[in-house]
Amino acid sequence: MKAPMTLELVWEHDLVLKGRSGDAGIVLDSAGQAGPSPVQALAFALAGCMAMDVVHILRKGRLDLRGLKIDLTAERAPEDPHRITAVAIAFTVTGEIPKDQIQRAIDLSHEKYCSVWHSMRQDISFTTTFSVGTGS
């Protein structure tokens, strides 16, 4: 079993909070100015989790990964608590990688490995797309 995760979150002013977990820190700001809002941080966490999985899977397969970019769009409910109701993630992968290997890496992240996705409500609509470039 993995060790429990611990963190500390301290209110600074207005709706700005500073958090720390081990050596890592974050500033959360409801207005999204001093740092991401909590919901933006959740979206960053999801995109980051999937990106790390995809990079790890493609590298483990010794594929020619040269770059990865994610664009995430999250739709939110109009009523409180304005939860995320749909997520669309577009992956842009740079390198000479077969499309089926990219799709496999994305699917493995979504279906098996991404702990952030598996911690979210599973009734959220979820779609992914990808494009490949050979870029510099």
For every predicted segment, state its role.
Residues 1-45, 54-136:
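Extended beta-strand/beta-hairpin segments
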Residues 49-50:
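Alpha-helical metal-binding/catalytic segments enriched in His/Glu/Asp
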